[in-house]
Every structure is written in structure tokens, then in C-alpha cells.
Amino acid sequence: MHKIDIDLVNMTLDVMKYAIDRISVTEPKIGIPQKEEDLKALVGETITDKGIGGEVAFNLWKEYLMKANVSIDHPRHLAFVPASPTRAAIMFDLVTSASSIHGAYWMEGAGGIFCENEAMKWIVSLTGLPEGAFGVFTSGGTAANLSAIVTAREYWRSLNDQNKVEKGLIITSIGAHSSIKAMAKVADVDILLVETEEKLTGTALRHTIESLTFHQRKRLFAVVATGGTTNAGIIDDLEGIAQVCEKENIWFHVDAAYGGGALVADSVRHLFNGIEKADSVTIDPHKWMFSPYDCGAVLYKQPKLAMNAHSQQGSYLDIFKDEGAHGFNPTDYQIQLTRRVRGLPLWFSLATHGTDKYKEAVERGIELAQIAGRMIEENPNVELVREPS
């Protein structure tokens, strides 16, 4: 399986041709999902004792299986939260896989981690977080949010012995992403949802905290604000929420997985005022920073607190923490030990195009939303439910 022969060479050429053709297409076929039994009837048994051969397997992919996927980079794919990775990022995703880099520890992945960190410095600079703030790339917003809340929970538990035996409580809005509720289950903390049709404000948060019982208030350790809700792009009152969290000594997390890319746009940057006061921030480069799936990011005002929460110990890991292997170890700041250097495609795209191009692209997206809003208003057959953010 690992030898280099003529079959491997031919397969490599076929795969590279396919990749080049796919990258070169500006309007790929949208694709149509099919039932599992229908796909099975088309391709038959693909996993067998002797194998079906690379050529046959690849042809099945091209002829049947690829066509059962919806191409989310199609220019008219407007549903859900589509991704539109740059060609540079897509190409370097190939390089990332081909390079076979383990991105957990500096000792094994110094070059790749260096590139990730260069991209991360840019993201951190967009938030305005204070000197010393930093972050790591994750598999997505769910892993980033979970990593942040576990960090917050462990910090809260470290404050006194009573917190170690209490079940923590977090507050967020009803419009928060589903991953907040999911990660609360995993982190074994309770969640209180603030009912609001619009954004969560500092005033609403303060009233919610004042309505808590004495015991609930003792268990409250974090507030999760949203920097762009999934359904409507609503950005919470980050400044007001930050002020309440600071006064109440509560961890302030901002889930900007969806909207965080807009931090680069001067026209809407003011909507995120207050994010610079967060204790942690989630941003997904695979959404509005034009990276291929999967690439999330979690940022910390005090990375040391994340290290205290996530650094794994084991005799087999000691060598990675030896002085001779000293460097930044991404695994110490999030829940995953094994990780690919998923920030590499973003780094290459940024290095290729420059940050000004990113700003132009995001501003253009905002402009298109405004144009779409006006077109809907002018059309008597449809109704504009909400003004573009």
C-alpha cells in the first residue's frame, strides 16, 4: 500500500487533474443528494477483501458519488452558511495533506505551526484584544466554543473549593448557536436562555442576573454573546455585556463564528465594539475568511488559563515539552490532542493575496446583502423580513 509504482503515479496524475479541473470551474454543478440505497445500487460494494482498485474507485467517485453532493461554493448557493474558499486556500489544503504534518506540538510541526501562528496574529489583531492574547485553530465553532467554556469553567473552579463541587451556569440568548447548548451538555454545565427577539443587551443581561436566586448567582461563571446569529446576523450588545461581565466578575465569551469575518470591514467594525474586552472569542475562518472546511479558531485574552485547562499529561508526551523542543504547542489550548495544521490554507491565502483583498471581499459581501435587500423591497411578490445588518 505504501510502495511507489506506475499505478500510483498514474493515480496521482488523475487526482491532480481532477483537482485542477474542479478548482478551475467557476460554476460547478450544484449536485443532488440521493438516498443511501440508490447510491448503493449505483456503486455496489466498494470495500472488499481484495480491493476494487484505485481507478475503479475514483471513477465511481467522479461518475456517481461526487454528483450526490451539493457544491457549497456555487455562486448561487445561498442557503445555510455557504463557504467560498479561495483557490489559493484550496490548493494549499492539498499541500497540507500531502505534507503529513502532526500539528499538536512544535517539536513535530514547527514550520506548519509557525504559519498558523502568523495567520492567528492577524485574526487576533482584528479583535483588538490586549497584548498577550492569542489563539489556536480548531475543527470548527463547536470545538472552539467548547474549548473556551471548558477554560472558563476550570478557571471558575480554581477560584475556591465550593466551585469545584457546584454545577456551573452560563447565560446566553435564545438566538445563540445550537453549539452553545450542545457544548453545555458536554461540559456538564447548566444554561439559562434569555428570551429576546432582537440582540442580547447589557441591560437585559443585568436584569437576568438580578432575577437569579442566590444559589444560581453563585453558580454563574460565564456569559456567551453572539457576534452574528445564524438566522439573521444579529450582533449582540457586546459593549454593554462586557461592562456587566466586568462588574460581576463573569467570564465573557463571544461566539463570532459566523460574523467574525466582518471584523475586517471598516463599514461595520463598530458593530463589534466591546469584543476587545472578551475573555475568549470564537471565529470560523471556513465561513467568512475564505478557508476550506474545516477551520475554526478560538482566541483567549489570557492563553495561560486555556493551557491550565487543556494541557494533557502523560509519559509519552513528556518529550514534546522538553526544553529542546520548546515552542508553541496548539494542543495545550483546546480539547483535541491529535490535530492537522488546518490554519495552513488560510495562511497561504493571506500570504498570496494580502489582507487588503480580504477586506475588499468582505465589504463586497456586505454590499451584495444591501443590494439584495433593496431588490426584495422593490419586488411586490416577496417581503423583506429584516434589514441587512
Describe each PLM feature range.
Residues 1, 99-107, 130-136, 166-167, ...:
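Glycine- and acidic
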Residues 84, 88-91, 137, 143-147:
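Conserved redox-cofactor binding core of oxidoreductases
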Residues 1-132:
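N-terminal entrance/gating region of PLP-dependent enzymes' catalytic architecture
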Residues 9-12, 119, 148, 184, ...:
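A residue-level signal for conserved active-site and pocket-lining positions in enzyme catalytic cores
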Residues 22, 122, 126, 151-158, ...:
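Active-site catalytic microenvironments for nucleophilic, acid-base chemistry
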Residues 274-380, 387:
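Active-site C-terminal subdomain of aminotransferase-like
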Residues 131-132, 385-389:
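Short Gly/Ser/Thr- and Asp/Glu-enriched loop/turn motifs at secondary-structure junctions
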Residues 140-307:
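Conserved PLP-enzyme active-site core in the AAT-like
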